[in-house]
Regions:
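Short, charge/polar-rich alpha-helical segments
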Residues: 1-28
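Short, charge-rich amphipathic interface segments used for partner binding and complex assembly
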Residues: 31-74
Length: 76
């Protein structure tokens, strides 16, 4: 039983690292696009859509992080 718990814990830790990386990636990309848009003199719809997309992805991955942390706490 302990063997399986250790495997599950390692898997969850690996997934948490992946989630945190994805959150960081989408946050930094969104920030770069926002800065680029602020420097532009005209409105770019594609850029606005990309910013919106990365904002939604940050929300989704933050929710996934919360769920995974809850599961990790329940398994301890």
């Amino acid at each position: 039983m302990n063997f399986f718990n250790n495997k599950i814990k390692k898997y969850q830790e690996k997934k948490l690292d992946e989630i945190l990386f994805k959150i960081q990636f989408h946050q930094s990309t969104k920030k770069e696009l926002e800065e680029k848009m602020n420097k532009m003199e005209y409105s770019d719809d594609k850029l606005a859509k990309d910013i919106s997309y990365h904002g939604k992805m940050v929300e989704i991955w933050c929710a996934n992080e919360t769920k995974l942390r809850k599961q990790m706490n329940e398994n301890q």
